[in-house]
Amino acid sequence: MKNSEKTLDMIVNLCKNRGFIYPGSEIYGGLANSWDYGPLGVEFKNNVKKAWMKKFVQESPYNVGLDAAILMNPQTWVTTGHVGNFSDPLVDCRACKSRNRADKLIADCEQGQNVDVDGMTFDQMDEFIATHPEVVCPVCGKHDFTPIRKFNLMFKTAIGVTEDSSSTCYLRPETAQGIFVNFANIQRTTRRKLPFGVCQVGKAFRNEITPGNFTFRTREFEQMECEFFCKPGTDLDWFAYWKDYCEKWLLSLGINKENLRLRDHEPAELAFYSRATTDIEYAFPFTDWGELWGIADRTNYDLGRHQEASGKSLEYFDPETNEHYIPYVIEPSLGCDRVALAFLCEAYDEEHLTDSKGKEDVRTVLHLHPFLAPFKCAVLPLSKKLGDKAMEIRNELAKDFMVDYDDAGSIDKRYRRQDEIGTPLCITVDFQTVGDDKVEADNCVTVRDRDTMEQIRMPISELKEYIAKKVAF
């Protein structure tokens, strides 16, 4: 099933009905664009994070991990420019009072498709909207907007018992700065030599004007970021290395290459401090292309700014050349929620089958990479009379894997339920497993493959090794 044949509604319905993702605070009417990961969703998302940490930290000879605080000294965000400049271009519709991002309005209109919105200033956006009546409000369809004004995306809060300017603090809008301010600590305590990287998975918060498309753009989200420090002059080589590394990670977890593209930023799109930026984009069902991963050569801008503002040296002493210099940084930045959504979109399939009697049926299946699947296997007793043996097998397997147990309904219906949530293997316990008056016990079970639906008979003693090989990454 091609992505062009899928819809966001298909993905959302499966997620809600099968316990992947629920609307946040639903019993109180919900909170706009707030989502809670359910029992299956939390396992799936944790597996996405594990897959990232495995390849970017555990198996990488260069990188180490970090878990920095969400709340940071507010001077951090003054130094980085977030307090003054981290904003979106906001316009109000005078007719219906709805609020919209000006750049999105321009990009969404037919004549705006070939316009380089990312390279436009606020004044240029204002002029474009004023001179193009086809830019209309998505709510009421009118062309009647206020001038653009800056809308700061940071969530402001207060620390302590009183609220004044001295207690102002912010929920971090990105995880990267926690890495930069800890650069000297990490380099000193790990005794790392350049090049090396620091990886972090954590929550970030942005007060988006127009969040939407399920978990694609939300105000609370999780990032998986790497800040890779290298010697100036080697940065473009490392930039190419991490572009290739990131794309291979996606492909190795089941993303089809035809659903990915690498888009290099034009010079007008680049931040003034960036030498190069490439977005890895995915063909989501609800848009032509949506950004998954940003890989940027940030030069020495971040460390340089923090050194200047803090008065603390963030230079690196190179023992090979006896030089002191501020390292350059390559930043591969990935949204965990967004890439998890891409994996769901990629894996979703509706297969049209015909049974032995000629009856047509539709099988909904998630072809998730087994490492990402919430459950690695499901134990299914053919009869509830076999529950004791089935539960014994389940409990033993659960020491090493996430295992589901289902004894309700026909075996075919139970297979379909597991297909729909992406369980790679179903283990059926039958009367031959335990034996009875008519058949001798063989201590074997039937193992069914999710993708091929093929079944094999296997000794219980070989299950763990078989499952481990099937779900390896």
Located regions from the model:
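NTP/phosphate- and nucleic-acid-binding module
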Residues: 1-473
